[in-house]
Curated annotation (Swiss-Prot):
Pfam families: RRF. It comes from Streptococcus mutans serotype c (strain ATCC 700610 / UA159). The gene is frr. One of its GO terms (molecular function) is ribosomal large subunit binding. It comes from the Bacteria. This is Ribosome-recycling factor. One of its GO terms (biological process) is translational termination.
């Protein structure tokens, strides 16, 4: 039972890391990256549909994204969804594909995005601490109902803290890498 608590915490930490990676992927760093468009949903026949299900997204050049719809009739809807999103890129529709030219980031924009990255990283750490608290509470509950001994509880708490520290270190590393990527000129 004790190992199950640690394994469950590890699993939830991994989900937090994946969520953070997706979040960082959607923060543009001056380079074209298909994940910039991951959050965009297109009204397609009245149903909100993720853009990546309606079109192939390629990166032909370092700062250009090419959106090629599978159904050409959805071109206008895709263009409208990109315009309505908060990514700050204007689509250029040439009748069969949509070109997105990623503008160079100004120093001020880079610093703002770096602040945003720090904030997102801090939120991920809060999520990690909440997962740790849940695991600790579960361990104490197990000790209270005599499923584990007091010594096993102390050992379990150390294990939980160890995996928590590793998860926080991983988040710090991910945050530092994204900040470095943003501040590169």
């Amino acid at each position: 039972m004790a190992n199950a608590i640690v394994e469950k915490a590890k699993e939830r930490f991994e989900q937090s890391h994946q969520s953070l990676a997706r979040e960082f992927g959607s923060i543009r760093a001056g380079r074209a990256n298909a994940s910039l468009l991951d959050r965009i949903e297109v009204e397609y026949y009245g149903v909100p549909t993720p853009l990546n299900q309606l079109a192939s997204i390629t990166v032909p050049e370092a700062r250009v994204l090419l959106v090629s719809p599978f159904d050409k009739s959805s071109l206008k809807d895709i263009e409208h969804a990109i315009n309505a999103s908060d990514i700050g890129i204007n689509p250029a529709n040439d009748g069969s594909v949509i070109r997105l030219v990623i503008p160079a980031l100004t120093e001020e924009t880079r610093k703002e995005l770096a602040k945003e990255v720090k904030k997102v990283g801090e939120n991920a750490k809060v999520a990690i601490r909440n997962i740790r608290r849940d695991a600790m509470d579960e361990a104490k509950k197990q000790e209270k109902i005599k499923e584990i001994t007091e010594d096993e509880l102390k050992s379990l708490e150390k294990d939980i803290q160890k995996v928590t520290d590793e998860a926080v270190k991983h988040i710090d590393s991910m945050t530092a890498n994204k900040e470095k990527e943003l501040l590169e000129v």
